[in-house]
């Protein structure tokens, strides 16, 4: 049974800054079993591991709350920070803050998770759906194409810049720079002061999935095209084509890239030469993120099947079938939490 606390503001959690630093989880080798399943009252847009035994849930109606993995009674505090839906959020594990955006309310909130209080709230006309945290600067896109650089401590405006073209992606890239993707295939690198560093034009569909590490930006689109970009110089290193749409966010692990296609295939690729190391063929669409856990990859098939693969050779370690299609998934220290199409949230525990 879920118990909803009477307090209407803030999150029900007790964490320190050290708790928010996620170390590498144990390898999920063992026998998977369901520890518990509960029915959520609203459909979640976000399910994310937060710290200790807490997971963060943000629903489409605009509720924000946490759940405790270890408790048989799921004690929850419902919090409605806005009158309307939440469009985007950022968890800053370096400061213990949660940033929430409502484009329908045109508002942005900074919440201190350590002291359980609101730091500041700012009204931003025409606020869009893209945000990024670059060092201590919060980047916010307006629907007008203007990017605002805000001081993350107080919400004050530091810089602003008008971007030509429709922005379809925005993210922090190492080291403390901003990546901007536009619908015309433009890829841009900016400093946290919104000064341009480099610009690259590539042939890629709008709204690609992308990821980055200290050296590279990897982008993939709905035609199966993959672009590997040097994130310091903004140069295209090489490109690949897997001839099937890619909707699932990519996984980088050292010099290896792991990706999944809409046809249910998972590939391991060597980024030194672009060669395919292995292929695993499953059944059905993959549109959830590939999750890395030391030497393994967790793959969620939309129809309800989870598969754990070895990163070195793609061999299957175990699989688990749920009764309904999977909508959300997040790794936790001893397993995985999933939400299905019936709004059922389940903790699949994997112990040696």
Q: Which role does the model predict for each range below?
A:
Residues 62-65, 71-86:
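Well-ordered, non-transmembrane segments within structured domains
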Residues 19-43:
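A short helix->beta-strand "capping" segment at the edge of beta-propeller domains
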Residues 68-72, 112-116, 151-154, 191-195, ...:
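Short loop/turn segments that connect beta-strands within beta-propeller blades
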Residues 9-18, 41-63, 84-109, 122-148, ...:
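Repeat-blade elements of multi-bladed beta-propeller folds
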Residues 4-6:
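C-terminal motif of bacterial Sec signal peptides marking the signal peptidase cleavage site
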Residues 34-38, 73-80, 117-122, 156-161, ...:
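A short beta-strand motif characteristic of beta-propeller blades
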């Amino acid at each position: 049974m879920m118990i909803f606390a009477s307090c209407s503001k803030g999150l029900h959690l007790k964490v320190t800054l050290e708790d928010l630093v996620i170390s590498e989880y144990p390898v999920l080798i063992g026998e998977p079993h369901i520890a518990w399943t509960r029915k959520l009252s609203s459909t979640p847009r976000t399910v994310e591991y937060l710290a200790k035994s807490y997971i963060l849930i943000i629903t489409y109606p605009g509720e924000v709350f946490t759940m405790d993995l270890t408790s048989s009674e799921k004690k929850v505090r419902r919090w409605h920070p806005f009158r309307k839906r939440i469009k985007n959020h950022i968890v800053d594990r370096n400061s213990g803050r949660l940033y929430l955006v409502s484009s329908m309310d045109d508002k942005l909130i900074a919440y201190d998770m350590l002291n359980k209080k609101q730091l500041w709230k700012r009204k931003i006309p025409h606020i869009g759906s893209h945000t990024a945290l670059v060092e201590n600067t919060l980047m916010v896109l307006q629907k007008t194409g203007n990017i605002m650089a805000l001081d993350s401590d107080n919400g004050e405006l530091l810089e602003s810049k008008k971007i030509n073209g429709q922005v379809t992606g925005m993210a922090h890239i190492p080291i403390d720079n901003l990546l901007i993707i536009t619908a015309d295939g433009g890829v841009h690198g900016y400093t946290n002061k919104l000064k341009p560093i480099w610009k690259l034009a590539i042939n890629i569909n709008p709204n690609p999935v992308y990821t980055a590490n200290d050296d590279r930006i990897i982008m993939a689109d709905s035609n199966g095209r993959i672009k590997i970009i040097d994130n310091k110089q903004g140069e295209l290193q090489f490109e690949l084509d897997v001839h099937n749409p890619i909707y699932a966010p990519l996984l980088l692990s050292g010099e290896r890239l792991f990706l999944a296609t809409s046809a249910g295939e998972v590939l391991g690729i060597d980024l030194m030469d672009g060669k395919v190391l292995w292929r695993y063929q499953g059944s059905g669409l993959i549109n959830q993120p590939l999750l890395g856990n030391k030497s393994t990859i967790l793959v969620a098939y939309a129809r309800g099947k989870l598969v754990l693969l070895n990163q070195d050779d793609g061999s299957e370690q175990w699989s688990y079938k749920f009764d309904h299609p999977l909508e959300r998934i997040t790794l936790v220290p001893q397993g995985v939490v999933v939400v299905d199409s019936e709004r059922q949230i389940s903790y699949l525990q994997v112990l040696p």
